[in-house]
A protein has these predicted regions:
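Short beta-strand segments that buttress and anchor functional surface loops
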Residues: 73-79
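Intrinsically disordered, low-complexity
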Residues: 1-20, 126-127
Length: 127
């Protein structure tokens, strides 16, 4: 992604904060799950069609090291005992935005949070 598109991804993801979480959700008016949020944000802000589950998205993107990660890249976690079972959008400064759960909805988190740091799988970027 170009720097402009990356910035658009971050801005769009921040605009989704506090939206509802809905399992399998992919739409603004009904809410999002983690992959639905990523799919919606990438389509709206960068024109990129990135569909499927978090694991599907991991297969379609390229692993990068933490030093190479830029705002707009994807960050993956193992939350269900399986690799890449959760995805969020990296916004820089050690933070990411994701659709967490029905109680909290779309929120911003820190990667160094004890829950997320234990489950961190890695950063990935579009090819």
């Amino acid at each position: 992604l170009s720097q402009d598109k990356r910035q658009d991804v971050v801005i769009q993801s921040m605009a989704m904060l506090d939206r509802n979480y809905t399992y399998g959700g992919k739409k603004l008016h009904t809410g999002f799950d983690c992959s639905g949020l990523v799919s919606f944000v990438y389509k709206q802000s960068a024109g990129v069609n990135l569909q499927g589950s978090a694991a599907d998205m991991a297969k379609r993107t390229q692993a990068i090291d933490a030093q190479s990660a830029q705002p707009g890249d994807l960050v993956f976690f193992n939350t269900l005992g399986t690799p890449n079972s959760h995805v969020g959008i990296y916004i820089g400064s050690g933070k990411f935005i994701h659709a967490a759960n029905e109680r909290t909805g779309v929120r911003q988190e820190r990667l160094d949070n004890s829950y997320w740091s234990k489950r961190f799988e890695g950063f990935r970027t579009l090819n």
